[in-house]
């Protein structure tokens, strides 16, 4: 393989250039995000699950249905003693309109979910579809798209 002179002098430049070219090529295949027929809320009871939270958030943010327009996440920290709160706050800072963080003393999953529902009602988010997903569960990329498609067909 023949390398251009500028690549011969700095092999790391060659690999960086190659990586950038590959990223630009792959961008054309990035899946399209869809606007939803409905809006959805996830209420999640969080207790000492820091090792799962990044994957949990990614599975929700990367939904085929557009996260910013259609999905709200209410994370209720049930008195976690690990780094869960900081991880949630990191994502909340990035998506302040979509992610709410609530803290309560440890009282169990049911009380956390009830607090999330209370928050939803008090803040009048006007969203009718609620699901409960635990932070150690990861949603398929098409989860909300499929639910939304089904509900749209039922209402027509």
Language-model region placement:
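Conserved donor NDP-sugar-binding/catalytic core segment of glycosyltransferases
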Residues: 142-156
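Glycine-rich, basic loop-to-helix element that forms the pyrophosphate-binding segment
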Residues: 104-124
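A conserved acidic beta->alpha catalytic loop
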Residues: 59, 77-86, 108
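Short, well-formed alpha-helical segments that are part of the catalytic scaffolds
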Residues: 49-64
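Short beta-strand/loop segment that forms part of the nucleotide-sugar
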Residues: 69-79, 100-105, 135
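Acidic helix N-cap motif at the loop->helix transition within catalytic regions
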Residues: 52-54, 82-91, 138, 142
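Cell-envelope/extracellular polymer assembly enzymes that use nucleotide-activated donors
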Residues: 38-41, 72
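Short beta-strand-to-loop acidic/aromatic patch adjacent to the donor-nucleotide binding site
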Residues: 124-138
């Amino acid at each position: 393989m023949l390398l251009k002179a500028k690549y011969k002098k700095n092999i790391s430049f060659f690999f960086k250039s190659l990586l950038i070219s590959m990223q630009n090529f792959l961008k054309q295949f990035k899946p399209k995000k869809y606007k939803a027929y409905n809006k959805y809320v996830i209420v999640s009871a969080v207790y000492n699950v820091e090792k799962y939270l990044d994957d949990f958030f990614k599975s929700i943010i990367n939904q085929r249905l557009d996260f910013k327009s259609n999905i709200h996440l209410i994370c209720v920290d049930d008195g976690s003693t690990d780094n869960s709160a900081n991880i949630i706050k990191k994502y909340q800072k990035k998506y302040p309109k979509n992610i709410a963080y609530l803290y309560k003393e440890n009282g169990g999953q049911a009380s956390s979910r009830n607090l999330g529902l209370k928050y939803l009602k008090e803040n009048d988010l006007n969203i009718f579809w609620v699901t409960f997903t635990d932070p150690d569960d990861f949603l398929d990329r098409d989860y909300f798209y499929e639910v939304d498609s089904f509900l749209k067909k039922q209402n027509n």
